[in-house]
């Protein structure tokens, strides 16, 4: 009966994925429990919601806390197995006829208490087997959590870089067409400068794309090494106490070395090529803009939308800066108009034009069709430029100093300029602007 009970007890504490005692056990929504490492590997590429490996029921939640009760029961079961092992005749000290309860860290042997204090072993470090094994297992689990975090981070970076390559290609194609259209407006047409501009754009794109490809290879290799190390640590965690202590070796140090030299994402940046006479020509339509300013933290959602949508980042800390929203006093509905805004002392900023209805609704939806904005947003340690209607990233260098805004109701277009470089950041296609708008400026100071 005792044997049947012991078998049933062990079965309830066994992971159905690895068929070993549960390690860092978690219980998912359907009630089944698994080793956290086993579940992580099982769900690594699963769609959300992932299915339970046992009953296939979908689990809307994918992040679980350690089941402390199960963890304690597994500890009890491991102790029982250890004492059963130590009670065998082989583990009785031949000299002192005592159970070998101590582990010698120097020669990786089991000793009785009297042997551990002998002249031969007295200078060595000794630990009770139970405590030493549990402590080492916790070290392994801690290292596995760090490894898994890095595995996920590396996978996210790899996904983002492949997505960046796709978006970069789209940006370059649209930018080349935009540059051609701008040069056609010049009289006389600067054919040589246009050709050089486009050749430089294509050359930079090819160089950046090759950087991205090399980065993908590094990230793939790092992902492979991290997973191999993670699985090696997991196998070590599953070993019985004595085997764990004897086989541990330098596995923790090796796992730490794998974490070194993590590949860093490539941040593409195209050079802002100057267009001769661009700012001079638009200055003919220069207007002075009067703004109504207000300090606000409400419209910080504008940047939160972009962060979550484009970069999959968490919310900004609304306490870290003052955000100034400003609307132009004048509404434009016809003609050509040009103005400049200084963004040199701003970290996150947005500028452009918006429909009156967008202001009245106090809307912050970045995907609204009522706004034509250029946004600069700092993500990690890199600045990103985007435009709205639709939201689209641009990989041109961040403008320093003043940014120009040009409204052309005759063609139905809005353009943004890097004034310092006399270059075009972005120009909406003809026919995009079909309603009255007023200037909008939004900035955060740190």
Swiss-Prot record:
Listed GO cellular component terms?
A: cytoplasm
> What UniProt keywords apply to this chain's record, in alphabetical order?
Coiled coil, Metal-binding, Zinc, Zinc-finger
Record-annotated residues binding Zn(2+)?
93, 96, 115, 121
**Does Zinc-finger appear among the keywords?**
yes
Please indicate if the UniProt record lists Cytoplasm as a keyword: no
Zinc fingers, RING-type class: 15-56
Which GO biological process entries does UniProt record here? innate immune response; regulation of gene expression
Q: Zinc fingers (B box-type) at which residues?
A: 88-129
Q: Which Pfam families match?
A: SPRY (PF00622), zf-B_box (PF00643), zf-C3HC4_4 (PF15227)
User: Which residues belong to any copy of the B30.2/SPRY domain?
Assistant: 269-446
- Annotated SMART domains: BBOX, RING, SPRY
> What Gene Ontology molecular-function terms does this entry list?
ubiquitin protein ligase activity; zinc ion binding
Give start-end ranges for the coiled-coil region(s): 129-158, 190-220
InterPro entries under this entry? B30.2/SPRY, B30.2/SPRY_sf, Butyrophylin_SPRY, ConA-like_dom_sf, SPRY_dom, TRIM/RBCC, Znf_B-box, Znf_RING
Of which family is this protein a member? Belongs to the TRIM/RBCC family.
Which PANTHER family has this protein been placed in?
A: E3 UBIQUITIN-PROTEIN LIGASE TRIM (PTHR24103)
Can you name this protein? Tripartite motif-containing protein 43B
Q: Which organism is it from?
A: Homo sapiens
């Amino acid at each position: 009966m005792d044997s049947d009970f012991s078998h049933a007890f062990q079965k309830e504490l066994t992971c159905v994925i690895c068929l070993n005692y549960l390690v860092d056990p978690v219980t998912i929504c359907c009630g089944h429990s698994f080793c956290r490492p086993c579940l992580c590997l099982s769900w690594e590429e699963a769609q959300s919601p992932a299915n339970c490996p046992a009953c296939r029921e979908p689990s809307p939640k994918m992040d679980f806390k350690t089941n402390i009760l199960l963890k304690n029961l597994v500890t009890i079961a491991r102790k029982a197995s250890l004492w059963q092992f130590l009670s065998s005749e082989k583990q009785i000290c031949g000299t002192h006829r005592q159970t070998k309860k101590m582990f010698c860290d120097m020669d990786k042997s089991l000793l009785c208490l009297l042997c551990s204090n002998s002249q031969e072993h007295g200078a060595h470090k000794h630990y009770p087997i139970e405590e030493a094994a549990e402590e080492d297992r916790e070290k392994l689990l801690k290292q596995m959590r760090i490894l898994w975090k890095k595995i996920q981070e590396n996978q996210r970076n790899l996904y983002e870089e492949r997505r960046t390559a796709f978006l970069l290609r789209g940006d370059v194609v649209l930018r080349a067409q935009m540059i051609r259209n701008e040069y056609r407006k010049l009289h006389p047409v600067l054919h040589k400068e246009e050709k050089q501009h486009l050749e430089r754009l294509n050359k930079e794109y090819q160089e950046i794309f090759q950087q991205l490809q090399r980065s993908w290879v590094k990230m793939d290799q790092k992902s492979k090494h991290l997973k191999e190390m993670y699985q090696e640590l997991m196998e070590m965690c599953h070993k019985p106490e004595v085997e764990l202590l004897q086989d541990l070796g330098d596995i923790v140090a090796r796992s730490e070395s794998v974490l070194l030299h993590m590949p860093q994402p490539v941040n593409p940046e195209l050079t802002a090529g100057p267009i001769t006479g661009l700012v001079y020509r638009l200055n003919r339509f220069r207007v002075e803009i009067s703004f109504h300013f207000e300090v606000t933290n409400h419209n910080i959602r504008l940047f939160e939308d972009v962060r979550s949508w484009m970069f999959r980042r968490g919310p900004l800390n609304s306490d870290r800066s003052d955000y100034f929203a400003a609307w132009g006093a004048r509404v434009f509905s016809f003609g050509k108009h040009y103005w400049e805004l200084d963004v040199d002392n701003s970290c996150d900023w947005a500028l452009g034009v918006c429909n009156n209805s967008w202001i009245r609704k106090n809307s912050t939806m970045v995907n609204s069709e009522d706004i034509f904005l250029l946004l600069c947003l700092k993500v990690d340690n890199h600045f990103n430029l985007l435009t709205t209607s639709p939201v689209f990233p641009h990989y041109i260098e961040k403008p320093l100093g003043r940014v120009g805004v040009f409204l052309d109701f005759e063609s139905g277009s809005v353009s943004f300029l890097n004034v310092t470089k006399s270059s075009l950041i972005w120009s909406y296609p003809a026919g995009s602007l079909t309603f009255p708008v007023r200037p909008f400026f939004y900035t955060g100071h740190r």
